[in-house]
Amino acid sequence: MKKVLKKVTAATMAATMVVGLAACGGSGSGSSDKSASKSGKIKIGVSIWSSTDVLGSQCKKILDEAAKALDVEVQYVDQGHVSEKVTASVEQLAAAGCQGIIICNSSDTEMTSAIKTCNDNKVYLAQFFRVISEKNSADIYQAAKDSDYYIGAVHEDEPANGEELVNILLEKGDRNIGLIGWEQGDATWLGRWEGYKAGVEKWNKENPNDKATLSEPQYAGTTSEGGSKAAEALMAADPDLDALIPAGGGGDPLQGAIAAVERAGKTSDIDIVSTDFLPDLGERLENGSMAGESGGHYCDPLISFMMVYNAIKGNYKDFGGKFEDVPFPYLYVSSPDDYKAYEKYFVDQLPYTDEELVDMSKLSMEDLKATAAKLSIEDAASRAGN
């Protein structure tokens, strides 16, 4: 199926991505004491599952560029989405003198500790790729809302993303779909799974004589090896398997799943869709090892970074009683031509220049939200003069 690039409509979005605790290098020295902030530079901490895998390294690249443009020091902690490491990372970054922290947590429960740590240390906090569920985690959501230091969350519409991806497979004729998750209970994973199931249920209702099945998930963690083993298990369990959805986890599980399908000699028999663009996605769309993918959202943490930066500067204030919910769009590609357009403005170059990053840092909260919502291939091309 040939699809043009498009964004998820994000107007009514509601819900919902290991190196121990060593700080990975970013802008500045990454020192572990509070002396760094005495230099006069703003210091922002980044708690991330990995700053070195496919998606994490893209996030780090745009954050480092923003830090350079704004003369900000950044310190990274890779926490592998292990709950105790997620909560400890916030404590570590606060102790290191960070005035603000952006975090990609694994589950809502971790945010209880993260919010308390930031309240106690008077450190501003914003989420990226995540949002606390007002419905499923009402107490934690209220704690975030009550906090004078929790700003809000930048996140994607994961159920819509999941439904879009499974529809790519269904429209290609796939009916036996294997599912690979990464961490049980991860809010983003649960949102995508909801979308996959909704897409299959809708298809089956409309096509009672041509029904599709979606397997129970195999869990891969966030490693390539995990993705490979999960794909092998699904292929062994269903000889008629004709599609796989490695749901996410930073890109490494997807690479492992692709390798397993290639080893089995089933590249032409099993279509694969996923989230988080691979660096060689164009080639994989060309050779058939990928059928489609959502991604291009590595600027999501950039918006969280700008929120925290402005809070530290005093430009954004009075957070108590508020929860800034910032929807961020996905891009979808399902052909080599789709990817070429993405590659030109998001891979060969960053979608924002240093001058544009400085201008972004001066936006009001509402204008920053609008900037996030409109990011697309067309938007990047227009700003590049094309």
Mark where each language-model region is:
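N-terminal regions of proteins, emphasizing targeting and processing segments when present
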Residues: V8, A22-A23
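Bacterial N-terminal signal peptides that target proteins for export
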Residues: M1-T12
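A residue-level marker of the well-folded mature domains of exported/periplasmic proteins
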Residues: K2-V4, M17, C24-N386
